[in-house]
């Protein structure tokens, strides 16, 4: 059980830091006015996972469980002069399982960003510091620095290219400590402004761990569709996406006597429903298929969730 609960933290942290998320979409929104703005969002909910799994430490329970979830985000944006933007925030998430309480995961993340629009291109840097605690124990600290370039092309295309340097420190598991270098490119194709758009992206990663068996290289491709529409006198938002990662390990994995090879496919869908001006609900579903020549890392999962939230 000890090995299982450690892995779940890593999965949560990588989900927080990886990929184009709504926070990044807002961070890159053009046309910010001078001054300071604040944003807060809180959510509570419940989710069911058909297979409580720990993909990044290669184990799964084969059993499902319910969990209560809590999320909170506080963010401040400061635009001292036109074209210069500073942003800082704190993000917290917590899961509380019904049966597998040893898998209760808390993630704390602080982040800061600075960007300047040079007209030809926007230059920025984003920093993340995250800590994961599982069942009350500190497990993983992750730091990341991500310089980036972005450019808006008219009203139909937005591109963002970035390099990420990441360092992982595992409490009590120094053989898994690692540094990673990644390059990524994301494109936002606006079909009807922000009412309907597509996000296409890719990332290549090289990770070097203390123990050679955990070194790997990977490439990832993703696509996401967002549609806002009116129904029941409300403006609803539908999101759907798919992500595929091919990961090849550089050295022999002792358990199988050969280098590992993983293929991971994740598809998800979500609908956001306003409940007045400040309140909202989210209904989501995610399917994950994890293929590997290491038997304990070969499985699939279904995750459904319902959340209620407030934002200011």
Residue ranges of model-derived segments:
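Cleavable N-terminal export/targeting peptides
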Residues: 1-35
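Gram-negative and organellar
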Residues: 23-312
């Amino acid at each position: 059980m000890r090995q299982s609960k450690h892995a779940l933290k890593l999965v949560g942290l990588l989900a927080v830091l990886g990929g184009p998320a709504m926070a990044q979409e807002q961070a890159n929104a053009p046309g910010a006015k001078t001054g300071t703005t604040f944003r807060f969002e809180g959510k509570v909910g419940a989710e069911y996972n058909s297979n409580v799994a720990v993909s990044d430490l290669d184990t799964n329970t084969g059993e499902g469980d319910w969990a209560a979830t809590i999320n909170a985000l506080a963010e401040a944006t400061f635009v001292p002069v036109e074209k210069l933007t500073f942003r800082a925030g704190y993000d917290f998430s917590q899961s509380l399982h019904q049966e597998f309480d040893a898998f209760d995961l808390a993630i704390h993340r602080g982040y800061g960003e600075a960007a300047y629009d040079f007209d030809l291109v926007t230059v920025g840097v984003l920093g993340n510091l995250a800590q994961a605690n599982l069942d009350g124990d500190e497990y993983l600290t992750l730091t990341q620095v991500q310089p980036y370039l972005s450019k808006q092309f008219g009203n139909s295309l937005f591109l963002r290219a970035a390099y990420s340097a990441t360092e992982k420190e595992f409490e009590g598991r120094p053989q898994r400590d690692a540094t990673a270098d990644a390059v990524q490119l994301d494109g936002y194709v606006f079909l009807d402004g922000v009412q309907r758009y597509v996000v296409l992206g890719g990332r290549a990663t090289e990770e070097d761990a203390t123990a050679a068996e955990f070194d790997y290289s990977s490439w990832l491709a993703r696509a996401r569709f967002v549609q806002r529409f009116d129904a029941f006198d409300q403006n609803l938002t539908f999101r759907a996406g798919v992500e595929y990662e091919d990961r090849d390990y550089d050295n022999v994995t002792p358990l199988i006597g050969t280098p590992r090879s993983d293929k991971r496919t994740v598809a998800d869908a979500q609908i956001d429903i306003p409940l007045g001006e400040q309140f909202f609900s989210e209904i989501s579903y995610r399917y994950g298929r994890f293929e590997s020549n290491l038997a304990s890392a070969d499985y699939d999962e279904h995750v459904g969730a319902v959340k209620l939230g407030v934002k200011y």
